Amino acid sequence: MGVIGIQLVVTMVMASVMQKIIPHYSLARWLLCNGSLRWYQHPTEEELRILAGKQQKGKTKKDRKYNGHIESKPLTIPKDIDLHLETKSVTEVDTLALHYFPEYQWLVDFTVAATVVYLVTEVYYNFMKPTQEMNISLVWCLLVLSFAIKVLFSLTTHYFKVEDGGERSVCVTFGFFFFVKAMAVLIVTENYLEFGLETGFTNFSDSAMQFLEKQGLESQSPVSKLTFKFFLAIFCSFIGAFLTFPGLRLAQMHLDALNLATEKITQTLLHINFLAPLFMVLLWVKPITKDYIMNPPLGKESIPLMTEATFDTLRLWLIILLCALRLAMMRSHLQAYLNLAQKCVDQMKKEAGRISTVELQKMVARVFYYLCVIALQYVAPLVMLLHTTLLLKTLGNHSWGIYPESISTLPVDNSLLSNSVYSELPSAEGKMKVTVTQITVALSSLKNIFTPLLFRGLLSFLTWWIAACLFSTSLFGLFYHQYLTVA
């Protein structure tokens, strides 16, 4: 079988690399520990005593004696104390104490490995053009998506465990909002949003009915269109709920990063990075793509500028470039988050009253402690967009070349396979060959049911939906942090 050929070798080599090399040379660790990120250290109690002008306390009458032990009152200092936090570069030792660091490192490093496997497989398919092999890189991409969704689910459940129900209410509210939004989008005709979902589902239903007829069963569609869209909307609502806080956090980091940026080019890239999901959403709006990109009006005539296949390829490349830009701007956003420690201290100085030294230390240390949570909220949507796009290219039978070319198909000689099944092979080896051939026929039948048209429509919609959810939540977060919070 072709399945145990070059692709399996590539998978085994990459598994060995992940086990032997990545623990020593990790991209996830380098993104945090390359020396560009600086975190704020919390002041010690002795430093706070000196700043507050207090001497080391001895035993006083105010101390309580309880079961033979003396409990002293917690030390408090004025909030308007002249405190300046010291910074330090993030090192590998510092990351050991970070919450969710193993999950962050695993997701990023596994994504790198899966992307390399995908690239090698694409080169192999481009030159060798195998027709009877399973594309193992698809399994890697699906694993990446499952890990990203699992991490986002874990982060979302963390908000449900908090005693304060504010975060829980936000997740539930946005979940219902995205469910209604998904149902509304799925009702819109393809004259406005060109996912190809209707065409793909119709092709799936027809192929399934033909398959059932060949098996001598009643020729009914396995699932109705309404049921399909209902369950798809439920899945989309969960994705939207998972992306709620990543979008809200992105908006806050975007505003803080803009305040830190001094160069015009950096500010421009930050704006493009924030609007990247909107650009992705507009790529599937048919009036824009058909009337202004593919057939731009020049005078009284509209001249075709490119074919649909060329535009599909350009759309894939644009999404990948925007994902690369988001990864490049990761450092600016994480540094903007780390600066929240000093920002909280500056805000505290404007308030009246006193604060305990323990609370002050917790307020400063908490920012760095949750650095990997913020990094996951930044990286996970990026990973989902990237690998959904890669799946769209492969399963949707698109091409990477922008020049017109015939789209390759994967023909399966069903007649030859069927003849092999019913050929008489009395030996044990012959029976094994019959079993293998029957499995091959079953897989080819599944290929005829789950066609590229179905995957193209479904994955186009999911890619668009992830970008739409991310932009919706980040836009709401921008409005909230800009106008509804007290500066």
UniProtKB/Swiss-Prot annotation:
- Name of this chain's protein: Transmembrane protein 161B
Claim: Iron-sulfur is one of the keywords in the record:
no
Functional note: Essential for maintaining normal cardiac rhythm in the developing heart and for neonatal survival. Inhibits potassium and calcium currents in the cardiomyocytes, this assists in timely action potential repolarization and thereby maintains normal cardiac rhythm.
Chief location: membrane
Known PANTHER family for this protein?
A: RE42071P, TRANSMEMBRANE PROTEIN 161B
What is the similarity comment for this entry?
Belongs to the TMEM161 family.
The signal peptide annotation in the UniProt record is: none
Compartments, record wording: Cell membrane
Query: What gene, per UniProt, encodes this protein?
Result: TMEM161B
What GO biological process terms does the UniProt entry carry, in alphabetical order?
regulation of cardiac muscle cell action potential; regulation of heart rate
Glycosylation (residues): 34, 135, 203
Where does the sequence pass through the membrane?
107-127, 136-156, 169-189, 228-248, 265-285, 305-325, 367-387, 459-479
Pfam families the UniProt entry points to? Tmemb_161AB (PF10268)
Q: Please provide, in alphabetical order, the Gene Ontology terms of the cellular component aspect for this entry.
A: plasma membrane
Keyword annotations for this protein?
A: Cell membrane, Glycoprotein, Membrane, Transmembrane, Transmembrane helix
Q: What membrane topology does the UniProt entry give?
A: Multi-pass membrane protein
